Amino acid sequence: TERYNASYIMTDLNIGPKLNLVTGVRLEVNKTKYTSYHGMQTTLPHFNSMGSDTVFSYERDNRYSLPSLFVKYDVTDWLSLRFAGTKTLTRPDYADIIPLYNISGGSGTVTYRNPFLEPGVSQNRDYVTTFYDNRLGLLSFSYFTKEIKDLIYSSGRRYITDPSLYGLPWYTEKNMIIDYKTNNPYKVLLSGFEIDYQTRFWYLPNLLRGLVFNANYTRTESEVKYPRTVIEQEIIFDPSFQVITSNVDSFYVDRLLDQPKDIINLSLGYDYKGFSGRLSMMYISCLLYTSDAADDRDS
C-alpha cells in the first residue's frame, strides 16, 4: 500500500510594473507498506529449507518540505532577467525498495533489495537573461546549478561482515550481496549553461513568412564522488591458517550517470493557416551509463 499526501501555500506578488515574485512551499508525506519474500535456496534447486520462503512487510515514512522562489524583472520591453530556486526529489524505484532478499546457499550470494534507500534531494538554481525583438525573436541565455544529496546508485558487490546492517539474518555473514544499491554519502555538483533561440520569419515575402526556426544548445559539467568497494582477502599462516575477507571502501571521481555533456536541438518548421509541420534533430554526446563499481571491474 502507498499513501501520498501533499499540501502547498503560494503567493504571487507584483512589486511595481517590472518586478514579479512567485514563492511558496510544498509539504509532502509519503507512507508506504511494501510486502515481499525472504527466501533461501539450498544446493538442491528443488528443495528449500522449512520456513525460508516467508512473506515480510516493511513500512516507510518520508516527509519533505519543498520551497520554491521565482523572480522576474523586466529591465526594458526587450530585456528580462529571471531567477528560479527550487528543491526537488528523486524517489527510488519500487523494485529497489521492496523488502526482498534471496539467499543462495550453494554460491554464498544474496540477491538483495534495499528498503532503507532514501529519496535523492536536489537544490536547483537557474539564472536566465532573455532578449526579445519582433524581428529577432526570443533569445535566452541560462546558467544553472544543482546540488544533489543522497544520489541513488549501484555500488557493486558487497561482502557481508554485519548482516544486521542490511536487515539480513545472522547466517548470511561472510556471504556476498550481488548488486548493492545505496545512497551516495557525497554531494553531487552539477552546473551548466543553455542558449535558446526561437523565431518566426513573418517579415519574409509570400510563402516564406510561414517559416519557423528553433535552436537550443546545453552544456553540462558534473562532478560525482562514487564510493567504491574493493573486496580483499588476506591469508594468514601464523599462528593458524585463515583467510580474512574485508571491504576496502574508497571513491573515484567521474561525471553524473546518464548526463551528457552536450545536447543540441534544431527545429525547422512551417505554419500556414491550419497546417503546421516540424523537422527536428537532436544530438546527444556520449553518456556514462554505469559506475565503475557497478561494472565490478575493480572488485
Spans of model-derived segments:
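Signature of Gram-negative outer-membrane beta-barrel scaffolds
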Residues: T1-T76, N102-I103
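Membrane-embedded beta-strands that build the outer-membrane beta-barrel scaffold
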Residues: S7-L13, L19-L27, P67-V75, L79-K87, ...
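Single conserved hydrophobic/aromatic residue that forms the stacking wall/gate
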Residues: Y289-S299
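Gram-negative outer-membrane beta-barrel proteins
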Residues: V29-Y37, L89-A95, L100, R135, ...
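Solvent-exposed loop segments that connect transmembrane elements
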Residues: K33-Y58, I97-R113, R157-D179, P227-Y252, ...
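Gram-negative outer-membrane beta-barrel transporters
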Residues: T145-E147, L165-C286
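Proline-centered helix-kink/hinge sites
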Residues: P67, P92, P260, A293-A294
